[in-house]
Amino acid sequence: MKKGLLTGLLLFGIFFGAGNLIFPPALGVSSGQNFWPAIFGFVVSGVGIAIVTLIVGTLNPNGYGAEMDEKISPLFSTVYLVLLYLSIGPLFAIPRTAATAFDIGVAPVVSESSLPWLLIFTTIYFVCAFLLAVNPTKILDSVGKILTPMFAILIVVLVILGIMKFNNAGTAAPTYETTSLAFGTGFIEGYQTLDALASVAFCIIAMSALKQLGFKDKKEYLYSVWIAGIVTGIGFSILYIGLGLLGNKFAVPAEVIANAKINKGAFVLSESTRAIFGNYGSIFLGVMVILTCFTTTVGLIVATSEFFNKKFPQLSYKTYTIIFTLVGFGIANIGLQDVIKFSVPMLLFLYPITIALVLIVIINKYVALSKLGMQLTMCVVTLISIVTVIGSTFKVEAINNVIAKLPLAAESLAWLLPTIVCLVISTVLPNRQKGKVYDFNEL
């Protein structure tokens, strides 16, 4: 049980980030009286899929890249991982952490014309992040280990007091009017945590850290990992539901709801903290968010630069850190809401592929599948993802009408049934074989 708890703390540290905290309260605001199906969809994708992805990834010492090389193709693996690292790195996650730090930590205390302040803040922020990323030290890890529990405790206290204090109770008109639409919207919002994508990238790091706890055999290792996953999942579910309720109960002014440039989650966090703890509490929250986001930013610059340097060694590690720092800086200055908006198409594309990949890896551990069938599965889910993104991004009614006719489309799972059908076909096509099961010494 002790090792399970330690493992749970490790998993919590991997997933916990200040950026994730803005989405549940924003969902609470927009869902109105359809809060519960919306937050359930968010928890399923934001917590459940992420933890299952991480745990399954710890069963292969070479991670998902090796699984894709073997089951699909090396080219597919490379393209997918490049897009994934760009998403959890300079295109979305890195600028989002910087923009979140500004929106919660700085924007509430500066003038309404925040553009020059955003530029000044991100310049200082990314210069410091670059200096640490070029020469990563263990000091940052130590700071993270101190900040994470402090920040988590602050958020828990804020949620409990906020739910007791505020009584708006979902009076805002919901953006989506049916239970299916509420679940589907929550499910897509859960993509924004980026945790499932991060699990694909960081499962090898997690496995290495887990092994240091000294498990005596594979059974104890797997038992502890699953227990930790369940405990972590429950913990994050409670945290997300609490933050969602905070947003649902907090009275957000109509002009804020109508302003597309204001992030509703950041607004709820900063204003509810001010209402409960006063100005000093708001300043404390801001400092915590800035520091937590900063440690995340440095970690993402390091991880992304290391991946690209290993995959494409023509450029040095330092060159990649310069490139990704500059890209993150540039995108962060368009503002938090626009960063989130621009990330949606890529997430709508990557998440179904990621979930299908995890399903293939899990099923293939127990059932012999054809390589041709697995390739067919990934082709189908990739095609549906591309078509869905084109239809939703460019408002192509003909495409949207076709997608809407697929089963589970209202729940944003139009790709799921075709994926399952292809996996069933994989069980009858020739040249089937089970995936390799590694013994404990190989893990």
Positions of the model-derived regions?
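Hydrophobic, membrane-embedded alpha-helices of multi-pass small-molecule transporters
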Residues: 8-16, 86, 161-168, 177-243, ...
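Hydrophobic alpha-helical segments and their helix-loop junctions in multi-pass secondary transporters
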Residues: 90, 94, 152-178, 196-197, ...
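Membrane-water interface regions at transmembrane-helix termini and the short interhelical loops
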Residues: 59-63, 67, 125-147, 212-215, ...
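Membrane-interface loop-to-helix entry segments
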Residues: 133-162, 343-355, 374-382
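Selective recognition of specific alpha-helical transmembrane segments in multi-pass small-molecule
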Residues: 48, 52, 150-162, 225-251, ...
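A generic transmembrane alpha-helix motif of multi-pass inner-membrane proteins
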Residues: 165, 370, 374-443
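Hydrophobic, small-residue-rich membrane helices and short re-entrant helix-turn-helix hairpins
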Residues: 135-146, 183, 206-235, 254-260, ...
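TM-loop-TM module centered on a large, flexible mid-protein loop between adjacent transmembrane helices
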Residues: 64-70, 239-294, 345
